[in-house]
Amino acid sequence: MVLPKGMRLKGYKSFDYIHKSAKRYKSDSMMLRVTKANERLIKSTIKNSKSNSCRCAISISNKVSKKAVIRNRLRRLLHNHLKKRLFQKDAFSNNWLLLSLSPKCLDKNTENLLEECDKLLIEAGFC
């Protein structure tokens, strides 16, 4: 299940902003970048959505796997997990999150990967 349109983070300007100004939290197989929302970088059609101002993106490079099937499976898994967390609490409001996976994530099973994601969210102060 993908995130609703109002919670998706899109556009190269948004990603550049996150890479330049975000606070980083790193673990063995992923990195979480968190920054305050900058609504000027969002297109006007997306701004009108009924979502809170929290937006998320998951970045998985070809280094993780050459097969798109595997990368998409990981993306869907993490989108679903973040979606549950976002609706569970309003602590994410007014923040942008970028979750980047490293090639070591393939060595872990799904439970360990989700636990690691939770640890990063706790370290960032969201849970």
Curated annotation (Swiss-Prot):
Give the first-level EC class, as a single word: hydrolase
Q: Which UniProt keywords apply?
A: Endonuclease, Hydrolase, Nuclease, RNA-binding, tRNA processing
Catalysed reaction(s) here are: Endonucleolytic cleavage of RNA, removing 5'-extranucleotides from tRNA precursor
Taxonomic superkingdom: Bacteria
Decide whether keyword Electron transport is in the record.
Answer: no
Q: What is its EC number?
A: 3.1.26.5
Q: Name one Pfam family in it.
A: Ribonuclease_P
* InterPro entries membership: Ribosomal_Su5_D2-typ_SF, Ribsml_uS5_D2-typ_fold_subgr, RNase_P
Q: Name one GO biological process term.
A: tRNA 5'-leader removal
An annotated GO cellular component: ribonuclease P complex
Give one GO term, molecular function aspect: ribonuclease P activity
- Primary role: RNaseP catalyzes the removal of the 5'-leader sequence from pre-tRNA to produce the mature 5'-terminus. It can also cleave other RNA substrates such as 4.5S RNA. The protein component plays an auxiliary but essential role in vivo by binding to the 5'-leader sequence and broadening the substrate specificity of the ribozyme.
Instruction: State the family named in the UniProt similarity comment for this chain.
Output: Belongs to the RnpA family.
Q: Which HAMAP family match?
A: RNase_P
* Assembly: Consists of a catalytic RNA component (M1 or rnpB) and a protein subunit.
Q: By what name is this protein known?
A: Ribonuclease P protein component
The taxonomy runs: Bacteria, Bacillati, Cyanobacteriota, Cyanophyceae, Synechococcales
Q: Gene encoding this chain?
A: rnpA
